[in-house]
Amino acid sequence: MSPVATESMYKPTTINQTAHQQAMDPLKSKQQSNATVNKPAFKPEPAVNLTPIKFAPIKEHQVQRAMVRRYFQDMEERAISDVIIVGAGSAGLSCAYALGTARPDLKITILESNVAPGGGCWLGGQLMSAMVCRKPADEFLDQVGVPYEDEGNFVVVKHAALFTSTVLSKVLAMPNVKMFNATACEDLIIKPCPINPGVQRIAGCVTNWTLVSLNHDHQSCMDPSTITAPLVCSFAGHDGPFGAFCVKRVASAGLSEGLGDMRPLDMERAEDHIANKTREILPGLIVGGMELSEFDGSARMGPTFGAMLLSGKRAAEVALQSLDRVKIEEGEVVGLAK
């Protein structure tokens, strides 16, 4: 029996209905449009006076060997480091810059769990671009060579990425600095302190590729690697899968009274605390940046970066004093310096 014709069967198709049909069946709509629409052919203007580009010949195995050789040479060389910096955000990079500039003889190794270093310093607050730094952090920007606009008590870098890319490029250009990104610190090396009996000392980092660290629940027997160092400077931040990792680990190991947990936002109190309280919380472990707020229970500062920069710089100063006090053999503290 034939269906009864209704008025709706004879209504013309609207533009909205056509768009809906195309969304439901894009392949069919594309075939129909190709059959009914005559598109004008695009004729690009011919390129004039452009020199042909011809790359030098290469074999795939050459690329592989060039990458593998350098990466594992770096791993072998940095199996013993002078300083490990955990976290390549604004505080960690500032520490690396200050430390590498002051002591080009030190082997500084940076561990960054993300593929892209920089932490939260590619943008300002709420995904906006400007970077606000309260004075006197402008002095550090001058040292690094980052331009800014002076607003009186604070300065503004036009885009946070300008600071991050500038300090990152200068840090990575230092011959004494090596960075392993996409590499997580998933534990700490902790040994009895040879200086203070009964006290434990941080003696390096346990590392793994981040994708492996994040998948231990899915596959067993993925053992890590290690880097030995007399000093670890941790700037692991306060969020993300590895946020505040080192202070959480020493708390779980029973080496601290626990975490203070970060308090709500108060810019003035927060920045003063973070910049001035950056310190060696345990023998061999200096903590700064937002990780320190999780340890001390201080306020968060929000989208102002001055304390991050000066916390990193302060950590470098503390690190140099700490290293000068101890005698080191094969990356391990064996006693006090004479």
From Swiss-Prot:
Per UniProt, which keywords does this protein have? Cytoplasm, Iron, Metal-binding, NAD, Nucleus, Thiamine biosynthesis, Transferase
Required co-factors: Fe cation
Instruction: Indicate where this protein resides in the cell.
Output: Cytoplasm; Nucleus
- Transferase found in the keyword field: yes
Region: Disordered, residue numbers: 1-43
**Record-stated family:** Belongs to the THI4 family.
Q: Which residues carry this modification: 2,3-didehydroalanine (Cys)?
A: 221
Decide whether keyword Phosphoprotein is in the record: no
**Modified how:** During the catalytic reaction, a sulfide is transferred from Cys-221 to a reaction intermediate, generating a dehydroalanine residue.
- Principal place where this protein is found? cytoplasm
Q: Which domain of life is it from?
A: Eukaryota
PANTHER family for this protein:
THIAMINE THIAZOLE SYNTHASE (PTHR43422:SF3)
Q: Where does substrate bind?
A: 91, 112-113, 120, 185, 223, 238, 290, 300-302
- Tell me one GO biological process term: thiamine biosynthetic process
Enzyme Commission number(s) = 2.4.2.60
One cellular component (GO) term of this entry: nucleus
What is the tissue specificity?
A: Highly expressed in haustoria, and only in low amounts in intercellular hyphae. Found in the basal hyphae of the uredia, but not in the pedicels and only at very low levels in uredospores.
Q: How does it assemble?
A: Homooctamer.
The UniProt GO MF terms for this protein read: cysteine-dependent adenosine diphosphate thiazole synthase activity; iron ion binding
Recorded hits in NCBIfam families, A to Z, give: sulfide-dependent adenosine diphosphate thiazole synthase
Q: Which SUPFAM superfamilies match?
A: FAD/NAD(P)-binding domain
Identify this protein by name: Thiamine thiazole synthase
